[in-house]
């Protein structure tokens, strides 16, 4: 039988102040890999498919409560909330959680909201170990080369846990033990409920310790065992910004490795950052300095980077995106983007289309094979198929109060430095001359031009800027011209 065959509940402790973060944001709301710390913990808990998940919140609960609700919506399952009004220790926090688990009988796993690397696989292994042999408590432990600062796991000859001894209370013999407490436990619900009622705060901190449940259970003749995690890095807690960065780097390392094993080439893993929700296809090439964030989807045979940041983007098969910042938009098959392109939300570039250097788009739909090659702003616009927008063109969409839409047809050719004063429509097959300001609709197949004829005022520089280098150059050129004439 596996963990999924047994009744379980998961309690996630997230009530602490997290003062070492030195932040106005509650500790578990800091993010790595595109998720908050508590989101990582809740996703791991949900991976067990337990009957109940309870999040215990307290400090900063006005921030944490809505965040938990959002994660519950993403998971499409209920996450119960327990409030710890005063942070009176881990035992007290679990007491608060038990109010939400009234009548539950089964296994209760207690984990923390600041262990973002902990996986559902490890929690499942803990649950399996707990139910394999009837046990009151199973401690998830880890072995460390340097266990300094951690509570040591003391076992008897049968391998049962007899004590968890904190560093300050440990003898030299016990300090030599490399197996330590991770702070994650599996409990028999009935035994936990009974032991919690017996907790005392007669300790240096004046708090109720969850670890005291182990002694109470053993005192009543119940077995306490341990399950050792295969990867201690999963159980690293985050208490300050340094540990946040370390956890983020380790999570990213794992995510990048998974992408490479899935068929992507990542040229420089050290400078490539990929959020956990990102999807990457096969035969993808990712160049240095690339960040793939949010729910970005990278199709097969896409090339990304270098120096590219994509957030909630969909890049379809065969496209190329170089030195680009893009948000909440879609790039079609075999399209090309960049370099130095800024794609704002609501952009759709069709298959085989192009957004070139120093192009910015926003709420723009650009059809199959259409190109915006250089130095252009396209906002609130629709461009048909196989059209070409000349360099340095601007879609003038804002009148100071409202945004307006521009529609460009298919097979349109516009000259450089064309201004489209929205709302305006350019029909299929139309052209515009360089420097044209289009204020009125252009019929299909028409050539739009604007502005008066060029007028040259002879001698203006010598008259208005006498003695300047420009005036001297002009006079010299005129003398040469007169001599040749």
UniProtKB/Swiss-Prot annotation:
Q: What class of enzyme is it?
A: transferase
Q: Which Gene3D superfamilies match?
A: Hexapeptide repeat proteins, Spore Coat Polysaccharide Biosynthesis Protein SpsA, Chain A
The note describing how and how many cofactors are bound reads: Binds 1 Mg(2+) ion per subunit.
InterPro entries, per database record? Bifunctional_GlmU (IPR005882), GlmU-like (IPR050065), GlmU_C_LbH (IPR038009), Hexapep (IPR001451), NTP_transferase_dom (IPR005835), Nucleotide-diphossugar_trans (IPR029044), Trimer_LpxA-like_sf (IPR011004)
EC number(s) on file: 2.7.7.23, 2.3.1.157
Cellular compartment(s) = Cytoplasm
Chain residue ranges for the region called Disordered: 465-485
Which amino acids does the record list as binding acetyl-CoA?
A: 391, 397-398, 416, 434
Provide any one GO MF term from the record: glucosamine-1-phosphate N-acetyltransferase activity
Disulphides? none
The Low complexity compositionally biased stretches are: 469-478
Listed A to Z, the keywords are: Acyltransferase, Cell shape, Cell wall biogenesis/degradation, Cytoplasm, Magnesium, Metal-binding, Multifunctional enzyme, Nucleotidyltransferase, Peptidoglycan synthesis, Repeat, Transferase
Question: Cofactor(s) for this protein?
Answer: Mg(2+)
What coarse category fits the chief subcellular location reported for this protein? Answer: cytoplasm
Described purpose of this protein according to its UniProt entry: Catalyzes the last two sequential reactions in the de novo biosynthetic pathway for UDP-N-acetylglucosamine (UDP-GlcNAc). The C-terminal domain catalyzes the transfer of acetyl group from acetyl coenzyme A to glucosamine-1-phosphate (GlcN-1-P) to produce N-acetylglucosamine-1-phosphate (GlcNAc-1-P), which is converted into UDP-GlcNAc by the transfer of uridine 5-monophosphate (from uridine 5-triphosphate), a reaction catalyzed by the N-terminal domain.
Q: What is this protein called?
A: Bifunctional protein GlmU
Q: Which organism is it from?
A: Corynebacterium glutamicum (strain R)
